[in-house]
């Protein structure tokens, strides 16, 4: 039974489809509308996931190319691999924290004015694993790890969407959805910084170009050209033998071009899924809200914001990559060298670009992305000594979610008050 609950709560597509179906039932829709709405929600979310998968698969070889091109060594921020690796040792604790934290989230939303329901399953799973690791390393028993971990995560599942909601409102223009992602506070902060120095009147989506370059107004064309340049230039710095290993013997420039185009295709698929998914889940979620948590807002994953400023996504990602690289080259001054986590910097940097654009236009998108890449990488480097992962057989990886890292720092500081060493 526990395994089934964990499986359901760890799979966001199942959660989303069930909630859509229940919401439509609560709204007393016809059987036809319930089936149609549930399946379209599921299809939209699966399309979104497929798009994200294509993006990740295009970024993996690029990340390898990038590391080889510039001879970088150090740690990479990556949550999911860590969460999976510790399940042999902390699987029970992770599972119970995941389940009870969701119940606490719903209870808080029901009893308080903070009506956010966190629905990003893989984020819930990685945070639960993080709590299990941190609290068990502080010497707590399994039961206390589960109790405290569930309470901390349940509160965080409401707190961080609440913190980011004013910024979400700036992006989407309403309160229909919230931000269910463990980087929401950092992305919101980055967007705010971008707004301080930007110009809201000059949106990244309205960049003026000469008539001869009018084709650049098409988001997919602009993104394709930019990513081809980035991939091809990076491939040019990789030696032929190494590049043959990465590409499987395909000409390195041909490989780079098609991986870049694959990235753009992933973005286009993701955006199509986002539009289909949001069109169904928002009205369905109102049905749930009316019956269980009046006024409930679904806190959803980061890609839902990309469709509001697609050009800003690319701008934010590239700016974040530059910011992350600066920290990498500062490694002699830091506890550890943090390699640019290309996948993490895309999802967070892209969102920072969108949030920065909403507050400060094109310049805001650039500044927000750069600020996120720089400060996120610094946060990882400076917090790295707080948690050791070698006892789980993990090396070269560390935590990648700024919100979770902030919570870990607070837990460690409170532990110090009770005599628990860092």
What is the predicted function of each stretch?
Residues 5-16, 85-99, 334-343:
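Structural signature of hydrophobic alpha-helical transmembrane segments
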Residues 17-19, 35, 59, 63-81, ...:
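Helix-loop-helix junctions within the multi-pass membrane cores of secondary transporters/permeases
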